[in-house]
């Protein structure tokens, strides 16, 4: 017996103590979870765990019989784990009744620890057997389990969900509860369902790598090309070039096979073959386009192979004089009968189809062996056909090329389609027992075997058959002046060689002239015909199965409308019966046409396009460097995959250039359609990964780029609150930042309590999704703070990333400053001061009607920040034309404020962003609210012919001029002219106008007019002075009416108050704001937008109330006006 090491403090365990010394622990009903006694091993001869008052020991002898019976009554199963026996060092140390009492997990309210060698028994609330459980099965915290990582319901049942972070981390409920499902002590309903599904799914047919992949790939690669074209290729290209052609094709397919293997081993592969591999790697755009043409190509390939079979049968009938009608119609009849029989095999189930494939493979291999055996048997009767068995002279003669009307690449284009069957196994990935193992092993081995056979046939045919033969017996006399290899056998075939290039040989036999040479060489020629039948039928059968499987996966993803009906599966194997009949219909249509010479190259190019994208998928995923790209197949290389993709594209044009162009046009058209439709899927494709990678890389690169005037972009932090609560400011800022600069929608949630971060995260995702769905190129960010100023300071300091940081603060004008809490005015003005302190520019937007529409449905946040309930539909692009006037809605329900949102399931439906009570009645909008709602949408509409008036009174670096220039360049504003207003002296108006015109020309900014205002400092009208005085009256300190000490105290408590000294000191500046308002009304009352230099107030010298009064006086009763003040860093330059 060997003792285990002492228990460390980190184990949080202590040995049991006598019951009298133990504090009262929780009863089973009081503890939070009820967990049973569990261990992983039991039985005689096994290592079991002993316990007593000393540190635990491991014992090898079996437990006493009494304890065995008392603990569990023998070994029994409970849930997913066994309840087994436990042994003690002595029966006295662990009484039977102690083990029988059951165990209770320590409650969350109690503590249990030990430090050093001392044991703190006071906190130990566990019974003895607590320490004997298998680790991880005595808490709600789950141990690693594969079921937690399934994305959807697994074949073994429903998806299991691990305990959430909230369940483990959040505060306990007041009432403790018992959880019998914690870590699997009992079967959950999902697991019970899984167990039931396992018992019901035993009849499902799943193939291994040989029957599922190797056999199918070999049958598809060994097509009729092996029997009727390989020898002709040797005659044209010679042995050397033929081997090079086979090796080149094999290199392309091997690279593609490695790429396929890499994708297939980068996670669980479902049904769908090439479509599934490409779509889950490159995304739905490429996957959807390839999936459709790949399924169609397989369907038409069925017709190609069946017609090839029918032509061979008709030739045999013609030789025997047994034609039924004529050659063409006989092909149609035989082809129709054949495809019906193949459909019956496919519909019968994958198991029958697999058996048929095995039978056909046996015939095919027998035919190949029949050829090689026959090549060693020299028969005199075959010499007249050019077959002399193996001869060094024939090998030397046939080693080089002898192209007759062909070139190397034309011959290569004829052979390459024979090598395009490598996805036959991957296409039924859903029917494989272990796709991750089967696809790499079966595909690559099939490429190797078939490649060796093709090379063997090329060498064999070139070494024993001459290129031309007459088929006429020789008289075996010595032939003079004969240099051919057949001469020494007494045959002179020199007359067969064409004397003029392009002339057809007069002989009908030999490598050049006879497509049935392999029948001549073979030991038993009918076996070659059987091999041809086997090759064509097996390929047709594989394509007939592949097309519905791929199409079924495409239908289930719902990328194209109207095809979901074909995604339904039947039976235990989820067979796509509707897909089978659709494939049968397509194949039958092309069989009846019986002219496949035009469609054949297109089909080959469809397959090659799929291979190219599979290779590109691996390169793309490797380039993205995503942590999720971890294929277990290591024998791939991203650059080899890129080379494979390029080679596939090159081969497409070699085979047929117009077919390659047509294929690319079809793929591009389908790609554009799927991109436009934007299917609601998220597969974690490499496109997404590369987008992140590029964004990260470029963001880091930007950090090393110094600021320059020419690269300045307005990057705006827009204090919108909830994004659609102030749509007007969102739309206007979007007009000059879209595709130009950054827009960050800032939202400060005011709360003095602990924030609900779960709700905060949910809202962040929801609001960002709303921006995306409404084509607003902006980001949403939210912070929780005790007041608005603190939250805004957080954003001013931390918003953005690297160089993608805001440089301009955009806020709405505070229309209710005179009726609201004056402390909010203090906060508002301090926001402006804070922005300037952080070197931000500041932009303030004011509309007569106001900006905030969130109150229209009565949803005001209790925290003080108004959250959105109404959302304005901006589904059209902000630059698109929208000249139609807004509808005059009479209620919230009928207003365009209702938006289209999406739930987690991706289904769109109409609802407000924040749901309101369904039982609440529809409230008609009053006139003011209707005007507010209409005003909030005015920047969505086409502005028509109007003006954007720029009052550039103070040089702030050019931001006041840049913003209207960017706005006027947008499609909705393109008919608006820019008018510039500047201040100047009456006696030099022309000079100032010419100087400004020169500056604007150097800035390359178009303008329609420049107005120099020489009367800005004229005294304003008395009405304006009176209104201003009445405006500021409630906010005066009136220090003359009180003691100096009391006045100073009041000023310190209420710093927003206006002192008489301050008012007198800034009297001229206040009068200027009144006068400017008069001039604005005079010159710009009909403008579509006014952009004006914002007056500054010195911090600490001008009170908040006085500054607010200036801004109000300057901008009241006007069209939409932007008050702009840059940070006085140049943003415009006339240098190149």
UniProtKB/Swiss-Prot annotation:
<feature type="region of interest" description="Disordered">
    <location>
        <begin position="1"/>
        <end position="73"/>
    </location>
</feature>
<feature type="region of interest" description="Disordered">
    <location>
        <begin position="875"/>
        <end position="921"/>
    </location>
</feature>
<feature type="binding site">
    <location>
        <position position="224"/>
    </location>
    <ligand>
        <name>chloride 1</name>
    </ligand>
</feature>
<feature type="transmembrane region" description="Discontinuously helical; Name=6">
    <location>
        <begin position="408"/>
        <end position="427"/>
    </location>
</feature>
<feature type="transmembrane region" description="Helical; Name=3">
    <location>
        <begin position="286"/>
        <end position="314"/>
    </location>
</feature>
<feature type="topological domain" description="Extracellular">
    <location>
        <begin position="235"/>
        <end position="238"/>
    </location>
</feature>
<feature type="transmembrane region" description="Helical; Name=5">
    <location>
        <begin position="352"/>
        <end position="376"/>
    </location>
</feature>
<feature type="modified residue" description="Phosphothreonine">
    <location>
        <position position="134"/>
    </location>
</feature>
<comment type="subunit">
    <text>Homodimer; adopts a domain-swap conformation at the scissor helices connecting the transmembrane domain and C-terminal domain.</text>
</comment>
<feature type="modified residue" description="Phosphothreonine">
    <location>
        <position position="129"/>
    </location>
</feature>
<dbReference type="GO" id="GO:0016324">
    <property type="term" value="C:apical plasma membrane"/>
</dbReference>
<feature type="transmembrane region" description="Helical; Name=12">
    <location>
        <begin position="657"/>
        <end position="672"/>
    </location>
</feature>
<feature type="binding site">
    <location>
        <position position="219"/>
    </location>
    <ligand>
        <name>Na(+)</name>
    </ligand>
</feature>
<feature type="topological domain" description="Cytoplasmic">
    <location>
        <begin position="673"/>
        <end position="1136"/>
    </location>
</feature>
<dbReference type="GO" id="GO:0055075">
    <property type="term" value="P:potassium ion homeostasis"/>
</dbReference>
<dbReference type="Pfam" id="PF03522">
    <property type="entry name" value="SLC12"/>
</dbReference>
<feature type="binding site">
    <location>
        <position position="294"/>
    </location>
    <ligand>
        <name>chloride 2</name>
    </ligand>
</feature>
<feature type="glycosylation site" description="N-linked (GlcNAc...) asparagine">
    <location>
        <position position="475"/>
    </location>
</feature>
<keyword id="KW-1015">Disulfide bond</keyword>
<feature type="glycosylation site" description="N-linked (GlcNAc...) asparagine">
    <location>
        <position position="481"/>
    </location>
</feature>
<keyword id="KW-0739">Sodium transport</keyword>
<protein>
    <recommendedName>
        <fullName>Solute carrier family 12 member 2</fullName>
    </recommendedName>
</protein>
<feature type="binding site">
    <location>
        <position position="422"/>
    </location>
    <ligand>
        <name>chloride 1</name>
    </ligand>
</feature>
<feature type="binding site">
    <location>
        <position position="225"/>
    </location>
    <ligand>
        <name>chloride 1</name>
    </ligand>
</feature>
<feature type="binding site">
    <location>
        <position position="417"/>
    </location>
    <ligand>
        <name>chloride 1</name>
    </ligand>
</feature>
<feature type="binding site">
    <location>
        <position position="222"/>
    </location>
    <ligand>
        <name>Na(+)</name>
    </ligand>
</feature>
<keyword id="KW-0597">Phosphoprotein</keyword>
<dbReference type="GO" id="GO:0008511">
    <property type="term" value="F:sodium:potassium:chloride symporter activity"/>
</dbReference>
<feature type="binding site">
    <location>
        <position position="221"/>
    </location>
    <ligand>
        <name>K(+)</name>
    </ligand>
</feature>
<dbReference type="GO" id="GO:0043583">
    <property type="term" value="P:ear development"/>
</dbReference>
<feature type="transmembrane region" description="Helical; Name=2">
    <location>
        <begin position="239"/>
        <end position="261"/>
    </location>
</feature>
<keyword id="KW-0406">Ion transport</keyword>
<feature type="binding site">
    <location>
        <position position="418"/>
    </location>
    <ligand>
        <name>K(+)</name>
    </ligand>
</feature>
<dbReference type="GO" id="GO:0048798">
    <property type="term" value="P:swim bladder inflation"/>
</dbReference>
<feature type="topological domain" description="Cytoplasmic">
    <location>
        <begin position="552"/>
        <end position="576"/>
    </location>
</feature>
<dbReference type="GO" id="GO:0042802">
    <property type="term" value="F:identical protein binding"/>
</dbReference>
<feature type="binding site">
    <location>
        <position position="418"/>
    </location>
    <ligand>
        <name>chloride 1</name>
    </ligand>
</feature>
<keyword id="KW-0325">Glycoprotein</keyword>
<keyword id="KW-0813">Transport</keyword>
<keyword id="KW-0630">Potassium</keyword>
<feature type="topological domain" description="Extracellular">
    <location>
        <begin position="377"/>
        <end position="407"/>
    </location>
</feature>
<feature type="disulfide bond">
    <location>
        <begin position="496"/>
        <end position="507"/>
    </location>
</feature>
């Amino acid at each position: 017996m060997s003792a285990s090491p002492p228990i460390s403090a980190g184990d949080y365990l202590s040995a049991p103590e006598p019951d009298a010394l133990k504090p009262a622990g929780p009863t089973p009903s009081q503890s939070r979870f009820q967990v049973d006694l569990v261990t992983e091993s039991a039985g005689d001869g096994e290592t079991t765990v002993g316990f007593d008052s000393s540190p635990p020991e491991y014992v090898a002898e079996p437990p006493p019989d009494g304890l065995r019976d008392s603990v569990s009554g023998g070994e029994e199963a409970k849930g997913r784990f066994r309840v087994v026996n436990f042994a003690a060092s002595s029966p006295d140390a662990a009484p039977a009744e102690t083990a029988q009492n059951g165990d209770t997990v320590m409650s969350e309210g109690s503590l249990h620890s030990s430090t050093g060698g001392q044991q703190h028994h006071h906190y130990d609330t566990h019974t003895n057997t607590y320490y004997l459980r298998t680790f991880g099965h005595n808490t709600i915290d789950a141990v690693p389990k594969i079921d937690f990582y399934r994305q959807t319901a697994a074949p073994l049942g429903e998806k299991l969900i691990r305990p959430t972070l909230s369940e483990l981390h959040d505060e306990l409920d007041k009432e403790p509860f018992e959880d019998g499902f914690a870590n699997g002590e009992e079967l959950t309903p999902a697991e019970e369902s899984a167990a039931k599904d396992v018992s019901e799914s035993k009849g499902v047919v799943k193939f291994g790598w040989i029957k599922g992949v190797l056999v199918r790939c070999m049958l598809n690669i060994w097509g009729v090309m092996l029997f009727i074209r390989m020898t002709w290729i040797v005659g044209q290209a010679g042995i050397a070039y033929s081997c090079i052609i086979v090796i080149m094709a094999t290199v392309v397919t091997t690279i593609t096979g490695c790429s396929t293997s890499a994708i297939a081993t980068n996670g669980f592969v479902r049904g769908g073959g090439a479509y599934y591999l490409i779509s889950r790697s490159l995304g739905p755009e490429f996957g959807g386009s390839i999936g459709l043409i790949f399924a169609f190509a397989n369907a038409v390939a069925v017709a190609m192979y069946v017609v090839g079979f029918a032509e061979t049968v008709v030739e045999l009938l013609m030789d025997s004089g047994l034609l039924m009608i004529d050659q063409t119609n006989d092909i149609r009849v035989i082809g129709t009968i054949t495809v019906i029989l193949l459909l019956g095999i496919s519909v019968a189930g994958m198991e029958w189809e697999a058996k048929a494939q095995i039978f056909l493979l046996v015939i095919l291999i027998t035919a190949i062996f029949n050829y090689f055996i026959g090549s060693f048997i020299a028969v005199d009767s075959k010499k007249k056909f050019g077959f002399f068995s193996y001869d060094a002279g024939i090998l030397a003669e046939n080693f080089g090329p002898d192209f007759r009307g062909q070139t190397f690449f034309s011959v290569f284009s004829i052979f390459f389609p024979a090598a395009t069957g490598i996805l036959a196994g991957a296409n039924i990935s859903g029917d494989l027992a272990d796709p991750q193992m089967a696809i790499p092993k079966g595909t690559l081995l099939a490429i190797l075997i078939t490649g060796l056979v093709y090379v063997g046939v090329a060498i064999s045919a070139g070494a024993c058959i001459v290129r031309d033969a007459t088929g006429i017996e020789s008289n075996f006399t010595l032939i003079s002046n004969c240099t051919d290899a057949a001469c020494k056998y007494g045959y002179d075939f020199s007359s067969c060689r064409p004397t003029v290039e392009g002339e057809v040989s007069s002989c009908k036999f030999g490598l050049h002239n006879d497509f049935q040479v392999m029948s001549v060489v073979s030991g038993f020629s009918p076996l070659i015909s059987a091999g041809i039948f086997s090759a064509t039928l097996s390929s047709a059968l594989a394509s007939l199965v592949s097309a519905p499987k791929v199409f079924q996966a495409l239908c289930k993803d719902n990328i194209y409308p109207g095809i979901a009906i074909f995604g339904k599966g039947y039976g235990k194997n989820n067979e796509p019966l509707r897909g089978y009949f659709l494939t049968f219909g397509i194949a039958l249509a092309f069989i009846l046409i019986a002219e496949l010479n035009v469609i054949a190259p297109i089909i080959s190019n469809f397959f090659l396009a799929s291979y190219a994208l599979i290779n590109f998928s691996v390169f793309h995923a490797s380039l993205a460097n995503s942590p999720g790209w971890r294929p277990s197949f290591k024998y791939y290389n991203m650059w080899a995959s890129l080379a494979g993709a390029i080679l596939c594209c090159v081969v497409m044009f070699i085979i047929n250039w117009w077919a390659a162009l047509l294929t690319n046009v079809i793929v591009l058209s389908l790609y554009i359609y799927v991109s436009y439709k934007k299917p609601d899927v998220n597969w974690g494709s490499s496109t997404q990964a590369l987008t992140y990678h590029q964004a990260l890389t470029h963001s880091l690169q930007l950090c090393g780029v110094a600021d320059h005037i020419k690269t300045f972009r307005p990057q705006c932090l827009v204090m919108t609150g909830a994004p659609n609560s102030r749509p007007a400011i969102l739309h206007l800022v979007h007009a000059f930042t879209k595709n130009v600069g950054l827009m960050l929608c800032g939202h400060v949630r005011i709360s003095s309590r602990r924030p609900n971060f779960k709700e905060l995260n949910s809202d962040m995702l929801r609001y960002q999704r709303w921006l995306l769905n409404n084509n607003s190129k902006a980001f949403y960010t939210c912070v929780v703070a005790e007041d608005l100023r603190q939250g805004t300071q957080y954003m001013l300091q931390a918003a953005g990333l690297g160089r993608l940081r805001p440089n301009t603060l955009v806020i709405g004008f505070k229309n209710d400053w005179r009726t609201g809490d004056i402390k909010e005015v203090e906060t508002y003005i301090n926001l402006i001061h804070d922005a300037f302190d952080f070197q931000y520019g500041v932009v303030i937007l004011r509309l007569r009607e106001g900006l905030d529409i969130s109150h229209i449905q009565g949803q005001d946040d209790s925290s003080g920040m108004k959250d959105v309930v109404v959302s304005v539909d901006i589904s059209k692009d902000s630059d698109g034309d929208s000249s139609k006037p807004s509808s005059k809605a009479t209620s919230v329900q009928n207003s365009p404020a209702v938006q289209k949102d999406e739930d987690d399931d991706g289904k769109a439906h109409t609802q407000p962003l924040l749901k309101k009570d369904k039982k609440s009645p529809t409230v008609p909008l009053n006139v003011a609210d209707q005007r507010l709602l209409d005003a909030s949408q005015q920047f969505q509409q086409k502005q028509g012919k109007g003006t954007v008036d720029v009052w550039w009174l103070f040089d702030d670096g050019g931001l006041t001029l840049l913003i209207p220039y960017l706005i006027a360049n947008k499609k909705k504003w393109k008919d608006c002219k820019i008018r510039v207003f500047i201040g100047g002296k009456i006696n030099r108006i022309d000079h100032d106008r010419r100087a400004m015109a020169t500056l604007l020309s150097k800035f390359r900014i178009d303008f329609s007019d420049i107005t120099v205002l020489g009367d800005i400092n004229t005294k304003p009208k008395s009405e304006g002075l009176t209104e201003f005085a009445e405006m500021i009256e409630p906010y005066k300190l009136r220090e003359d009416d009180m003691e100096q000490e009391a006045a100073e105290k009041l000023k310190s408590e209420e710093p927003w108050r206006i002192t008489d000294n301050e008012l007198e000191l800034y009297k001229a500046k206040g009068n200027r704001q009144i006068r400017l308002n008069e001039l604005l009304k005079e010159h710009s009352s009909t403008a579509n937008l006014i952009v004006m230099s914002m007056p500054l107030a010195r911090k600490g010298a001008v009170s908040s109330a006085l500054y607010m009064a200036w801004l109000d006086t300057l901008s009241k009763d006007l069209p939409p006006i932007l008050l702009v003040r840059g940070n006085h860093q140049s943003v415009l330059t006339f240098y190149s």
